[in-house]
Amino acid sequence: MKLGCHISISKGFPQAVENAHRLGCEAFQFFTKNPRGFKGKSADPEAAARGRALMAEYGLVAVAHAPYITNLSTPDPELQAISIASLKQDLENAEAYGAIGCVCHMGKHVGEGEAYGRARMVETLNRLLEAYTGSCPLLLENTAGMGSELGTHLEELMEVRSRVEQPERIAFCFDTCHAFAAGIYRPEDWEDFVAHARAIGYWGLLRAVHLNDSKFDHGSRKDRHANLGKGFLGEAGIATLLRSGAFEGLPVVLETPVKDEAEYGPEIAYARSLLQ
């Protein structure tokens, strides 16, 4: 696996790559734009090229993340159109920066019902993948199940992907906190969980992992990340996940609560120590 964390690109993509390297990252994640909005700039070709060259020099892998505000299942036609345009730009920027994929949360049905939410998501994804013709895959992320969130179960993610017209352009990102809070695994049954995920085809489509502890207990359906070893997964639980070999070959990035990016350095080192 390639361990790392989330890095800001507010000072430019090349600087983000330098910051990731300085913190001891082997992989890093970045937001394509402000995570709370739809407005963003297209990637600067020169800066993107410099960043990609640095990534190659340092052996870094990058993962992009679309804004949290994106709702693939919105029933509002205007908001759907805005979301598609925004995600198209996210994918274009992710491709320019050399990211292995662009993460997007599963949709929220906002009271319209789960069946509607899934159908609307498929429609939105079809329109998006018709508009964006590049090579960067969209990585759908599992959710904790807060409110009307879809995508708590792996089977649901697989179903949505199977219904899309171009499923080969969609893969997955697995969040350890979300899945635990959704109640779909415990550390003590991790091996069985991964075996099931492999059996249904999900694990073979996994391209990135978010390594987070959980501030709330198993099945709480609350999306609140905790620092590694400080939540309900605990040190033993995080160690179980890391030592299992399930994340072999994948970028594994921390999205844990920090006041400053520099705090990620010791936490990445801590994660590596759990592999011993």
Swiss-Prot record:
Binding positions for Zn(2+) 1 per the UniProt entry: 65, 105, 141
Cofactor note: Binds 3 Zn(2+) ions.
SUPFAM superfamilies (UniProt xref): Xylose isomerase-like
Binding site for Zn(2+) 3: 178, 223, 225
Cofactor(s) needed: Zn(2+)
Catalytic activity: Endonucleolytic cleavage to 5'-phosphooligonucleotide end-products
Source organism superkingdom: Bacteria
Nuclease listed as a keyword: yes
InterPro entries xrefs: AP_endonuc_2 (IPR001719), AP_endonuc_F2_Zn_BS (IPR018246), Xyl_isomerase-like_sf (IPR036237), Xyl_isomerase-like_TIM-brl (IPR013022)
Binding-site residues, Zn(2+) 2: 141, 175, 210, 255
UniProt entry keywords in alphabetical sequence: DNA damage, DNA repair, Endonuclease, Hydrolase, Metal-binding, Nuclease, Zinc
HAMAP family: Nfo
Homology family: Belongs to the AP endonuclease 2 family.
Role of this protein: Endonuclease IV plays a role in DNA repair. It cleaves phosphodiester bonds at apurinic or apyrimidinic (AP) sites, generating a 3'-hydroxyl group and a 5'-terminal sugar phosphate.
Protein name as annotated: Probable endonuclease 4
Organism: Symbiobacterium thermophilum (strain DSM 24528 / JCM 14929 / IAM 14863 / T)
Gene name per UniProt: nfo
